[in-house]
Amino acid sequence: MKNRKFWHWIKNDAGESDTADTPTVRTLYLNGVIAAESWLDDDVTPQLFKDELESGTGDIEVWLDSPGGDVMAATQIYNMLKNYKGKVTVKIDSLAASAASVVAMAGDEILMSPLSLMLIHNPLTVAAGNVDDMQKAIDMLDEVKQSIINAYELKTGLSRAKYRI
């Protein structure tokens, strides 16, 4: 079964070669749920995303339309985009919700239409077990919350106190 990725690349101005005056910009469409692992070959891991990201050079435009997903996978993608050598422009097509909002923060520039939405919320999980297990889940969620606030704080320059998620 062929993998169905939640992203795909398009190289702008097909057939045009890179020059110092007109470098080619690659376009990444990141659509759908962000996942850490593929269970049914319908998601792709961050490692495969990294391989494709690093397969080209130059500036990139990321068109983002995602309801979010796994925050740890989103964190990996955020880090890959932040470490990318070219300029990263994030364009929120319609929705950057939940973990996708973390990916958006990796852009050197973030652009949204007046109709686009960004949803930021407290991280969620499913937990089962006794009171000790529940406390561990609460502590883990608190750590995740603080880590994603780091991305928002770094991008906006707003103090942590401004984020009431």
Model region roles, listed by residue range:
Residues 1-99, 106-165:
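N-terminal organellar transit peptides
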